[in-house]
Amino acid sequence: MSAIESVLHETRQFAPPAALEQAATISGMPAYRALAAEAENDYEGFWARLAREGLAWHKPFTKVLDESNAPFYKWFEDGELNASYNCLDRHVEAGNGERVAVIFEADDGTVTRVTYADLLARVSRFANALKKRGIGKGDRVVIYIPMSIEGIVAMQACARIGATHSVVFGGFSAKSLNERLVDVGATALITADEQARGGKTLPLKSIADEAIALGGCEAVKSVIVYRRTGGKIDWHAERDLWMHELTAGESDQCEPEWVGAEHPLFILYTSGSTGKPKGVQHSTGGYLLWAAQTMKWTFDWKPTDVFWCTADIGWVTGHTYITYGPLACGGTQVVFEGVPTYPDAGRFWKMIGDHKVTVFYTAPTAIRSLIKAAEADDKVHPKSYDLSSLRIIGTVGEPINPEAWMWYHKHVGQERCPIVDTWWQTETGGHMITPLPGATPTVPGSCTLPLPGIMAAVVDETGQDVPNGQGGILVVKRPWPAMIRTIWGDPERFKKSYYPEELGGRLYLAGDGTVRDKDTGYFTIMGRIDDVLNVSGHRLGTMEIESALVSHELVAEAAVVGRPDDTTGEAVVAFVVLKRSRPEGEEAAALAKTLRDWVGKQIGPIAKPKDIRFGDNLPKTRSGKIMRRLLRSLAKGEAITQDTSTLENPAILDQLAEVR
């Protein structure tokens, strides 16, 4: 692989606000450098100190890091704890039971407040109900539920009894849900009658029924249903149970199941570049430590904060910065069921004012869509709302382009709130590279520097460091507590995916092209180096989308690539070969719509191609390999400048370039 060219040269820089810096957990760059030096000088001692200070251990650990079976690293292995106890009981026992844990705003604007004592009681009742259904330590429970207090309760209840949860985003199809139910070997499924978003409903229970009917889910003995809307649903006696009926008679006391630090807290599926989704397995101790620690560092968390992460609990951001991180700190957070544009595009800004949000964390995709709305209508512009409570704002899910960063800084942060542009992944468990609000001078479009203890680097294809200013591959040189432990059921795929022999087998491969600034050493993410697409902050495997297209009766072959998109960051572009002659004009437009809807049904709406082009063939080498780099150029509307000497059918390029 040749060196990646860096084309972004950003010179604007913004210092942390003086008042915030003075009171920050990490105050000033000397404090940051001191922590980073502590980690470099005594790596195990650094992590041991954080783990002892940050978590409540039922049985203290004596071992910190076991590297004997690398890359299957173990952290705090002989220690015992419980995630739910750390998120709930210890705050109640400390006298903070009446502190508000969650301010929940429903799609229709209804607001519910739940204290730590209330949440502990609800989690305990549901945990007792799960135990009565025979669910316990080591079982896997799939959760397919809307954004809700009940979703948090379900996750925490699983953690309380030692069951491993696997949350599936509510936008996924029956087929995608079935794949995850089968792969994880779920014994129970927790879902809802319907999901309410943007004034519309989605029939989650019927999708769940369809997923189970697809087969391979014989282990699922219980389907527990949260009644969200009261909508009509099919009912399967013995298997289906109402959540509210199950918990009604249960005790609000449930002794936590103490588990080893390496016990799997959850398995979360993320797309791979080769077909089958990857079940990313996370531990209890190391993961929870980092969820809490990054709240304190990245968001400078204070007991007086009202934190709001706009993610869904179906993604890792919702796990770490809704279900676990804020609660592990004992904080108050806003949880939102709806979408940023309903009933209008001022919803986020109104909620910040209504709930006096102090720390706001959202995705660049949301920001870009709200910029468009705000510029078209002053009524939904941030300037029309009271955002004075904000002190820190952040971004997650994908790199944010400098123009959107500056708009966010000016109109939402009011030029006084630092932006924490966070880089991390499902596999990393929590933030890895990010500004610190009271220490790091920020630069639009850059995630700046690694957190203390995170040994990130940019290397070439042989694993050798590249000089600052030259693009390369982002890696992490040493294990960290919150890291992925394995891919569920596929340890060989884990090693090949994240610790490839090409890089020596000891460097964690992030899969992002990255460059470090020549002067500051700041990291800037340049995009994925493999074929995983990042659409609205969601990672989607091209192979999954291609497989969905080819499963349609009219499709013979398909290739999917991404292209830059102002709203979603990256858009899905599909090149399709039919089993019959290539359609044109209105026929092509109608069939493209049919195939978009088909992909939405097979995978979920997020995977629908924005552009479908029909060709008589795909550009292939003589050995039959699809030349995706050429398709990427065509998708972007660029002239083909690459070597096409190995191309078997050069004329197809002109045909695919002409089709829109």
From Swiss-Prot:
EC number(s) stated in the UniProt entry for this protein: 6.2.1.1
The protein's matches in Gene3D superfamilies, at most eight in alphabetical order, are given as: 3.30.300.30, N-terminal domain of ligase-like
Q: Name one GO cellular component term.
A: cytosol
**Signal listed as a keyword:** no
Which amino acid positions bind CoA, per UniProt?
A: R197, G198, G199, K200, T317, S536
* First-tier enzyme category under EC: ligase
Q: Name one GO molecular function term.
A: AMP binding
Q: Which domain of life is it from?
A: Bacteria
Q: Which GO terms describe its biological process?
A: acetyl-CoA biosynthetic process from acetate
What are the UniProt keywords, alphabetically? Answer: Acetylation, ATP-binding, Ligase, Magnesium, Metal-binding, Nucleotide-binding
Q: N6-acetyllysine: which positions carry it?
A: K625
Q: Please give the cofactor(s) recorded in the UniProt entry for this protein.
A: Mg(2+)
Q: Which HAMAP family match?
A: Ac_CoA_synth (MF_01123)
State the family it belongs to. Answer: Belongs to the ATP-dependent AMP-binding enzyme family.
Q: What does this protein do?
A: Catalyzes the conversion of acetate into acetyl-CoA (AcCoA), an essential intermediate at the junction of anabolic and catabolic pathways. AcsA undergoes a two-step reaction. In the first half reaction, AcsA combines acetate with ATP to form acetyl-adenylate (AcAMP) intermediate. In the second half reaction, it can then transfer the acetyl group from AcAMP to the sulfhydryl group of CoA, forming the product AcCoA.
Name this polypeptide is given: Acetyl-coenzyme A synthetase
Organism of this sequence: Burkholderia lata (strain ATCC 17760 / DSM 23089 / LMG 22485 / NCIMB 9086 / R18194 / 383)
Designated gene of the protein: acsA
